[in-house]
Amino acid sequence: NGQESLQEGFEVVNTSTSSFDETWQPVWGENKDIRNHYNELLVELKQTSTGRFMNLRFRVYDDGIGFRYEFPQQRNLVYFVVREEHSQFAMSGDHTAWWIPGDYDTQEYDYTESKLSEIRGLLQGAVSGNASQTVFSPTGVQTSLQMKTAEGLYINLHEAALVDYSCMHLNLDDKNLIFESWLTPDAVGN
């Protein structure tokens, strides 16, 4: 389509911080009250060559962090398809992980427990018989991915708020222990 990538050429236009604290009651669940309390950093970016804007929103909770990309309404970015996302998650060690193979068509697998460095060697054996399978990489896993560090800290990588956006798998660079987001394509390959 001739449009410049949204991967580079951005400058920071503005940053702002805020805090939020509320308690809400779910209709159903184990807890009567749920506290939603976080500190937030909003980074507003402008791509200098195109004049397009993108925001990065980070939220820090007592028990986790989250981030998302936002595309404010703008004349020069009305309709677009995100085919790839290159978010990376660098692990601090060869953690124990509970994972299933990254597959576009099914999540019907038993979980495997292994070190991150062992995923490549175990993945093919973790693929059980199923009529509809599309494993995308020898080191690809599905989210949510649960891990435990040698110090006993639990880590969970997952996506949230998927509105008009593809679900995320993770592809592991097993030499450097870095996961990169890997989006599930739609029916026509976007």
Please state what every model-predicted region is:
Residues 1-190:
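N-terminal accessory beta-strand-rich subdomains and adjacent acidic, glycine-rich linkers
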